[in-house]
Amino acid sequence: AFTELCDDMSNMQTALGKLRVAGSGGQYMLLLDDIWRLSGSCVSLMSQIPSSHIDTAELNSFVVRIGDYARALSKKALNDEERTAEDEEQLTALYDSCARISRELNDRLSIGDVPTAAVTNEGYYESAYAQDVKQSDDIDKFPTLIYDGPFSESSEKREAKGLGTDEIDRETARATAEKLTGTDRMEDAGETEGTIASWDFTATDEQGRETGISIAKRGGKIVWFMGSAAGGENQMPDEATRERMKQAALEWLGKAGFDDMHATYAQYYSGAGVINFAATKDDIILYNDLVKVWVDIETNEVIGADARNYLFSHTEREMPTPSVNPGEAEAKVSVNLEIESRELALIPITVETERLCYEFKGRCGEDEYIVYIDAQTGAEQQIFVIINTENGQLTA
């Protein structure tokens, strides 16, 4: 219950943060529903924690009031009432308080040192809209932490669209494997059947480090390969090194037959950087068509790649013409978001559908967000919060 409570408080903090930059409409209502449900889950979890470990009275009161406030805002939205300046101040106060509690829970819950002082200020709770709300622990919807950037792990695909048509033999696959790994000592490692059938190989270098690689039988593109980094610290390198690594990855992608790729997000650990690249067409980012590339921080060599998302998704697309112009789309973004960049992107909605959206990146206070506005309807499609760590960026 301790771990689940920490997770739910963190997820509630994330949802409150997104709510500050959400416009009206579907995303706003979904976030309010998330917050209410997470509030109910936290109340249920606290009932399972011995009172000696946590002052449940104060924390319970705080969490219940967050849920109450979310339901009150939902009722306002359903009545077509606009959010007021008082609402904005209330949301910011709740977010800040939730963030403090979430940090302290993760740091101190295990030893029973909980920061109840952070939740006792009645100014955080006073609301003319608070209503009695029936709590529910039937949680069927949570904000999901998405590593490597938005849409990096999209839903399981039904068929591989980007393989090509021509079948290749093992020796042709071996030549490709040797070219892409820089070794001529590839040994047979069997073959893989399934949606992406492949010829598999391994190699061992002079230092005893192994490399495994799979080449698609149909089309001959790399499916994945993985070697080992020379070593190094688990931290993000300086900007010049990151740029050098990105260029090395782009050069390797071109050699592997992946053209017009755009670097999105990166993580750095175990002496390597893992950089996400999305395909582009007509300057539109295709978030479904992703290739991850591992680059050794010390040697700047590409030591791994995973092209499965790309092979499942990449196909010729007819891009729709936006019905909403950039200015109209920007007007749909909350005034609380200080916009820093704008792109066009094709984002996954379901396993089989994508939507052309304007991608707005910006800040609300100290926090960074990405907001997607549908380029055809002007509806708010998705919101992500960017989480900066010593190893790179995550989104949630």
Task: State where each predicted segment sits.
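Long, terminal "pre-/pro-" and other extracytoplasmic accessory regions
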Residues: A1-A396
